Amino acid sequence: MKALKRYGQNFLVDRNILGVMMKQAGLSENDCVLEIGPGHGVLTREILAQKVKCLHCVELDERLRPELEGIRDERLILHWGDAVKYDYSSLEPFPNKVIANIPYKITTPLIWELLKFADRGLRYMLLMLQKEAAERITALPDTKARYPLGVCIDAVGMARVVRRVPPQCFRPAPKVDSAVVEIEITRNFVLTGSELWSEVLHLGFAHRRKTLANNLKGISLPEGLGEKRAEDLSA
């Protein structure tokens, strides 16, 4: 089956990378997992082999329905739709972990959406991302790569690059390098669902060279914070 460019399909096929991801995720029979874009089910089968409690898969490409429905496992729950627009609040049982090779063009909006469910019990994500996106998410304070999503993740937990992944590990091979990124959500669970918090972060980065006081006029800021720039923020 030909991969569709409009869906950003680059299927992970390297067994060594799959093994690295499974070892890193440390899955157990208590975990309910969400996979975004299961494709041909290669990662799906690896997750099910870890004896997880259940696995939700959200897939947009209806051409993959026969192949995915052919995976006979009562723990597998298939959902069809756009991952960015999907109503994740309807998932039962609700996942505590996300493991996915996600289409790179939806990386930022998808992670923002998933973070909203920290107060429902989502605590962990292991994601295959474009290397550039991985570097931005894990960028340190006071660096040019720093952006709102990275600051938000810092406020609720941590993110780190686990492994860099070359193009030949995918079919078709993307034109960019990739990386496996681990995100742990350990605190401030309600914060990720706050529209005000998201708005403040984005406004803070609207003009990177300006201080927070200038970008957030009309908002009362703690002493000393107004002179900082958004990229200087840390947890």
List each language-model region with its residue ranges.
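C-terminal lobe and adjacent flexible extensions of AdoMet/dcAdoMet transferase-like proteins
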Residues: I185, L201-A235
